Amino acid sequence: FQWGNHDICWIGAASGSLACIASVVRISAKYGNFNTLESGYGINLLPLAKFALDTYAGDPCECFKITGSQSYDPYDPDMDRKLHKAITVILFKLEGQLIARHPEYHMEQRLLLDKIDFEEKTVTIDGKRYPLDDCNFPTIDKNDPYKLSEGEEVVMQKLRASFLGSEKLQRHISFLFARGSMYLPCNGNLLYHGCVPLEENGAFKEVQVGDATYHGRALFEKLEEWVRKGYYLPEGEERRFGQDTMWFLWANENSPLYGKERMTTFERYFVKDPSCYYEAKSAYYKYLDNDKVITAILNEFGLDGKSPSAHIINGHMPVHLKSGET
């Protein structure tokens, strides 16, 4: 099977990537899916819960209501909202640190904590100011907004130890590595989850990974190489780069697993104006019915693009019915 964007986020979390850990916990908190973390994988959420209750005491955290699922038991919804807010703020800080480490990601537009005007309770996004629905951020230092507070640092190190120490999670991730990959040629067909990064004109897009650029098949293979290094190498610079690559695959516009210009998580929590929620899709999706481009992709991955039996079998195809998509 082929890794998807959520698979890669879990792989990153199991590898010890703080940004991926925070992403996995935030999504679980948003949907009230605590059982998977606590009962399924033995992840200890108590340090995060204690921190959240202390830090956001008196804050109703209305922007952080639990979307809910069949398994969600709202025993203490106030605590759940606080936990949800605490990990979300931590996530934005960790993502900011990661973006600063990797200017080649070209994700500066996602650095929003330093664009907050705490007095006016607004945030500037793409040059436009928006009022914030929530501006209670006791752990954000205006002079160093992406730095974790001491309490947040302790929480994340405990979560990291819990993810790394979960035998069941590590066993499941080992299975993803043993049986999964970025792409798979099979019976003359090409399988992958998301997209092949393309330019607006349909040509293969060059994407920087480390000190070099890659496109098409070479890009998929180089990214997979770094993912495996990020999990299997001993602690060090290369392992950390591999883990950062996992987060890149989760959220970057040039990721073959994501394929959108940006991930507007911050806006959806704090800004009422839905116009800033838009996540433009990769140029790839314009060419799904273009025989020339599809043939070029199949050929690039070593298949016969002219064969009538050759197909691209593609996952990650969200359809917005309310917007008229089919």
What do these predicted regions represent?
Residues 1-326:
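Feature recognizes metal-dependent phosphohydrolase scaffolds
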